[in-house]
């Protein structure tokens, strides 16, 4: 049951943060937090992570919906299994983050990002993220680690 609620929780939490970013952050405004290591700023991303495919919003939207459908099906197939908690967690985080970003893209034509980091390589410093991006990343990292372990 929790595995079907977690994607909804991610979706709602990030939706609230995106709304707050839209309402309270001005264009080009940067608010440093955590001793300047993290920066809050509003960015409208019409493409995928890093801004790729910005001119193909509808294609990205369709592909995302298709992939999310497959992930939901996989999560449903694991529903009754007790030993697959880590796999279910990875799927639930990925689905929740994907749903939130898909919804933004579907309703607005862009995804609202609001967090940057002031450390690491310059390319990394230029990227802007949202909570859904982190959930997708950690969910996919967990699923990859499980897959690597199972293939041994």
Summary of predicted features, one role per range:
Residues 1-152:
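Alpha-helical transmembrane bundles and membrane-interface segments of multipass inner-membrane proteins
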